Structures are given as structure tokens and as C-alpha cells.
């Protein structure tokens, strides 16, 4: 017991010796008295009379300055009987909410909510909408339905005939004026004038200009051939 206390309180490094059994058998280690160990112990020991201990009170660190009675070292103080200031605040005031770390699922939910709020609804223009047939036609073959023919009134036909008598071809500006006057569309005016010109050509039976140009070109070719023959002679 004395040897172990000497090794602990000594300031020197513990040397490496052979096993103690050999030294104990050969009486290499002499037995030291109690005065030897007491002298080494007195070097590190401070007498309480010479160096008195200062009366220092330890103050705990907390939210509020609450002084606790000093407890000598080596003793355990039971704090179960004394309420803590943090518990008193939570009981008297509103409950304190501590925001813990968010989980992966909560972060994904917040990202999805932000994405849905930032995403705006797509704009659907009229030309993007597809017109569906509401009624089912058993005779429908799959082709586009024919447009209904325009039934012109006598007043409209009379005004169109008068215009065709002076001008068989209309400019776009004049076509807009007639369509506005007769309450028709430009397309209807254009189609009527096309049909009227075809009828007028059929009634007058004009000769084909392409047929007349063919013999004239052949006649010119024959004349040019004769001239080349004469020059060759």
C-alpha cells in the first residue's frame, strides 16, 4: 500500500525494473521506514494552517441568477426539492416551442408546395381547342362535311351583277366595300365573282389562246429553217 502511494505521488517517471519477485528473494530492495514516505508526501502536501482556503462560492450559469447554497467538494447535493427556473417559466408562461430539425419528408413537402404556388396555369388559346361533333351522324364517312351553299337574295344578286358589268375583277378594297354594303363576307364575294367569270367565259366561247400560239410558233420555226438553208447555199 505504501509502495503504490509513493509511485502515485512521486514526481519522477516510473522506471522499468525486472519483476519484483527476484528482488524480493535476493533482498535487493531494502525496507524503508515510514519517515521516508512521509517526507516525500510532505513536499506536495500544503498545510491548511499555512495556506488557508479562500471562501469561494460557486455561482451556476443559467437564464436567471439563482444562488444555490455552497456544497463542500466530494458531496452530492440533491436538487429534487428545489424547482428549476426553466420549469417555473414554462409553467407560469406560454409553452416554449423549440423548432427541431426538419426531416426529409417535411423538406420535400415544402419544396412541392412552393413549386405548385410558383407554377401558373397554362393558357389555352382558341386555336388549341378541338371542335367535337355533338350529334352522331350514321351516314358520316369520315370526310369533312360540305359547306352549305350561300343563298343570295335578289337584291344582292342585282348589285353583284351591276358591279360585274363594270369590273369583272375586283380589288381587295372594293371587295371589302361591297361585302360591307351587302352584309356578306369577302370570301362569298370572291367565290361569286369566280363563278360569274367562268359562266361569262362559257357563254361567250372565247377561243383558246394556247391553241393559237402553237401554230404560230411552228410557222416561225419553218421560216427560220428556210433562212438557214438559204445561207448554207
Curated annotation (Swiss-Prot):
Keywords: Developmental protein, DNA-binding, Homeobox, Nucleus, Transcription, Transcription regulation. SMART domains: HOX. GO terms for cellular component: nucleoplasm. A motif (Antp-type hexapeptide) lies at residues 124-129. It is found in: Nucleus. Residues 145-204 bind DNA. One of its GO terms (molecular function) is DNA-binding transcription factor activity, RNA polymerase II-specific. Pfam families: Homeodomain (PF00046). Residues 203-233 are annotated as: Disordered. Residues 223-233 have a biased composition (Basic and acidic residues). One of its GO terms (biological process) is positive regulation of transcription by RNA polymerase II. SUPFAM superfamilies: Homeodomain-like. Belongs to the Antp homeobox family. Deformed subfamily. Sequence-specific transcription factor which is part of a developmental regulatory system that provides cells with specific positional identities on the anterior-posterior axis. This is Homeobox protein Hox-D4a. It comes from Takifugu rubripes (Japanese pufferfish). The lineage of its organism: Eukaryota, Metazoa, Chordata, Craniata, Vertebrata.
Amino acid at each position: 500500500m505504501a509502495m503504490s502511494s509513493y509511485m502515485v505521488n512521486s514526481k519522477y517517471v516510473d522506471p522499468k525494473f525486472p519483476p519484483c519477485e527476484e528482488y524480493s528473494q535476493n533482498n535487493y530492495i531494502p525496507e524503508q521506514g515510514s519517515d521516508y514516505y512521509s517526507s516525500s508526501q510532505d513536499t506536495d502536501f500544503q498545510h491548511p494552517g499555512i495556506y488557508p482556503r479562500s471562501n469561494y462560492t460557486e455561482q451556476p450559469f443559467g437564464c436567471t441568477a439563482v444562488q444555490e447554497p455552497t456544497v463542500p467538494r466530494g458531496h452530492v447535493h440533491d436538487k429534487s426539492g428545489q424547482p428549476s427556473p426553466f420549469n417555473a417559466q414554462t409553467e407560469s408562461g406560454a409553452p416554449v416551442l423549440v423548432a427541431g430539425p426538419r426531416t426529409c419528408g417535411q423538406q420535400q413537402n415544402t419544396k412541392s408546395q412552393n413549386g405548385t404556388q410558383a407554377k401558373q396555369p397554362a393558357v389555352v388559346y382558341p386555336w388549341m381547342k378541338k371542335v367535337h361533333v355533338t350529334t352522331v351522324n350514321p351516314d358520316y364517312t369520315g370526310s369533312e362535311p360540305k359547306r352549305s351553299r350561300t343563298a343570295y337574295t335578289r337584291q344582292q344578286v342585282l348589285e353583284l351583277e351591276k358591279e360585274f358589268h363594270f369590273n369583272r375583277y375586283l380589288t381587295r378594297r372594293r371587295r371589302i366595300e361591297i361585302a360591307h354594303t351587302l352584309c356578306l363576307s369577302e370570301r362569298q364575294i370572291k367565290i361569286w365573282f369566280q363563278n360569274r367569270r367562268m359562266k361569262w367565259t362559257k357563254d361567250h366561247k372565247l377561243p383558246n389562246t394556247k391553241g393559237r400560239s402553237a401554230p404560230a410558233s411552228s410557222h416561225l420555226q419553218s421560216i427560220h429553217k428556210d433562212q438557214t438553208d438559204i445561207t448554207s447555199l
